[in-house]
Amino acid sequence: MSDYGLPPGLNDIAALAERALHEIPLGQFPGIRELTIAVEDSPDDEMLAELGLSSPWELTGLYKGIPLDQRGIADWGQEPDQVVLFREPILLEWIETGDSLPDLVRTVLIHEIAHHFGFTDEQIEALEQKTRDGAARH
């Protein structure tokens, strides 16, 4: 991270995401290392329209792919699933909440990975809370 008052860049967010990915227990998410992670500045208009969102600030991350619990035989062997993190909305949330940036990136990453595994919103919230509790103990 920059110590000179500059906002964290794409590479900074990517490094935080990679670190967070390697902190996630593999037993909880088998096959997690097969996901690719990308960091972009913000979602594009097409993405927002597909999701029914009007503002790019509403979307901090996106899972692109077919959740494991919805895959059929024809879906295997397709392009790897991807989690995209959006730097600018993440930074805005970071500023607004005062949360630690590594914790926020980890939360967004875990939320999107949980979509890959077909978790419900309730399961995702429980997982995020468990992860926050675990991070607080370290």
List each language-model region with its residue ranges.
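Catalytic glutamate of the conserved HExxH
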Residues: V108, E112-H116
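Active-site rim/adjacent substrate-binding subdomains
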Residues: M1-L104, H116, T120-A126, R132-A136
